Design a protein with these regions (language model features):
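Eukaryotic acidic, Ser/Thr-rich intrinsically disordered low-complexity regions
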Residues: 457-474
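Alpha-solenoid helical repeat scaffolds
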Residues: 2-8, 12-443, 469-474
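C-terminal interaction modules of eukaryotic adaptor/scaffold proteins
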Residues: 448-454, 458
């Protein structure tokens, strides 16, 4: 009797195994056929359905295979088959995830996709995918609501890093500040390559260079040849004034990274690193590379690079090149302002201080630049005249020639009757009066006029000693 019992059980088990094997074989055939776009893929899927109509998991696999091939009709069909096969019926969370993915990827109704994901959450609140997918869909409507949904996930999915998930939502929404703040709270050791990529970028572009470097170094442990991690490790080290460390990444970035497309910004930053290290040859070479690559769509503009090159030559007292690149800068900057015009005057002034033989010529060019500033930008007319006078003083330090007199007189004419003078205007007026007072007393031999200017100075600054001395003269 026992022998018969065992024979019956063995037969049942063999039958079950054979059925299971057949189901799996039909499923695999369908999956392979869909993936390879076989002509009979639909027929293979139909056969697999007949063999697996009670296997919800298998039916979702077929639906996902169709979704990967952008066959949304069959993806939806098999999602519904899976939902019917689920226990309880129509409460199978993976089926709703699939329906949501179809709508989110190829549909036009984000609300409908979010509805499917909500049903997935309701039927399996311990599966983090529903929360994450709902948040990804809803981020376009309200990133803060999407973040709140992920907070709901925390209670039911304690193993999930919600800080990283929330940060990802904000990054996709273009809110780098919120992305950074949430990544900064996440456990960096649990972040994958994609999260670290977002962490390093959100940190760098919000000015948190310590965290940018930390994220880049963590990413390089996972993928040493990653271009983004090497690039931003180089940039972050520069911003942290770790110039030798920044230099160590120059070779790595340009020679030991995969899929790196080098830009004008890369070469510009590299030039700044070499500049900080006083490596002038490499600095100028990198500036040249940056200028050869820059175009209208570049992150950094041509005029900004030209200005940096000019500043570098000025620092090196290479005045010819400083002027050349500064004039190129002025020629290509779209909207010039008075500071740009004054920059030209300042280069000529510094050059004059370092070239006695050409001093008169160069001061003349500085004065000309200031006069142009006053003409182009009338709001700077007073300041322009004052600076022209200051330049003239470099050629007439005692004031005997009176070179600065016309410009100081212009300052006085523009300011002395101005009712609402600010502190800087009072300062310019006071020193203009001082020059005219000294000129009248020392070279004009006109004590009365000198005293007149002295009284005007004391009305501005009662404690100004030189004016007090002139006033007290008998």
């Amino acid at each position: 009797m026992k022998a018969i019992k065992y024979l019956v059980m063995a037969a049942l088990m063999l039958g079950f195994s054979a059925t299971a094997f057949a189901q799996e074989a039909e499923l695999n055939a369908a999956l392979e056929g869909i993936k390879s776009k076989a002509p009979n893929a639909a027929e293979l899927a139909k056969t697999a359905y007949k063999k697996n109509k009670k296997n919800a998991e298998a039916l979702v696999k077929i639906g996902r295979a169709f979704l990967e091939q952008k066959d949304t009709a069959n993806a939806n069909l098999f999602a519904n088959y899976a939902n019917e096969a689920g226990k309880p019926k129509y409460q199978y969370a993976p089926a709703y995830l699939l329906l949501g993915d179809v709508e989110a990827s190829y549909g036009t109704d984000g609300g409908k996709a979010a509805g499917y994901y909500n049903q997935a959450i309701a039927f399996d609140p311990t599966n983090p995918e529903g929360y994450k997918k709902w948040a990804l869909v809803y981020r376009k409507i309200s990133p803060s609501q999407a973040a709140k949904k992920l907070q709901d996930m925390k209670a039911n999915c304690p193993g999930e890093d919600i800080d990283a998930a929330i940060a990802h939502i904000y990054m996709l929404a273009g809110d780098e500040k919120q992305a950074y703040e949430n990544y900064a709270k996440a456990d960096i050791n649990k972040l994958d390559k994609g999260n670290l990529n977002e962490f390093v970028r959100s940190s760098y572009f919000t000015g948190h260079f310590d965290d940018a470097l930390r994220a880049a170094e963590a990413g390089l442990k996972i993928e040493p040849r990653n271009a983004v991690f090497n690039r931003l490790a180089m940039f972050a080290n520069y911003e942290l004034k770790k110039y030798d460390a920044a230099k160590s990444y120059i070779h790595k970035y340009f020679n030991e990274t995969d899929s790196a497309k080098f830009s004008e910004y890369d070469h510009f930053y590299t030039a700044l690193i070499y500049q900080a290290l006083e490596d002038k040859a490499n600095m100028y070479a990198e500036y040249d590379k940056a200028l050869s690559l820059v175009n209208d769509s570049s992150m950094i503009k041509r005029h900004a690079i030209l200005k940096s090159v000019s500043d570098s030559y000025l620092k090196d007292l290479a005045f010819d090149n400083a002027i050349k690149y500064y004039q190129d800068y002025l020629a290509c900057k779209p909207e010039l302002n008075s500071d740009d015009q004054e920059g030209l005057a300042k280069i000529y002034s510094k050059w004059a201080d370092n070239d006695e033989a050409r001093k008169s010529e160069l001061i003349g060019k500085a004065i000309e630049a200031y006069r142009v500033m006053g003409e182009k930008y009338p709001i700077q007319a007073i300041y322009s005249a004052y600076q022209c006078a200051t330049m003239s003083n470099k050629l007439d330090k005692t004031g005997e020639k009176g070179l600065a007199k016309p410009d100081y007189q212009k300052v006085v004419s523009l300011l002395e009757n101005k009712a609402d003078r600010d502190n800087s205007e009072n300062t310019m007026l006071k020193y203009s009066y001082h020059y005219l007072m000294s000129n009248a007393f020392l070279y004009g031999k006109n004590k009365a006029l000198a005293k007149e200017y002295a009284n005007k100075i004391l009305a501005i600054d009662p404690d100004y000693a030189p004016a007090q001395q002139i006033k007290d003269l008998k």
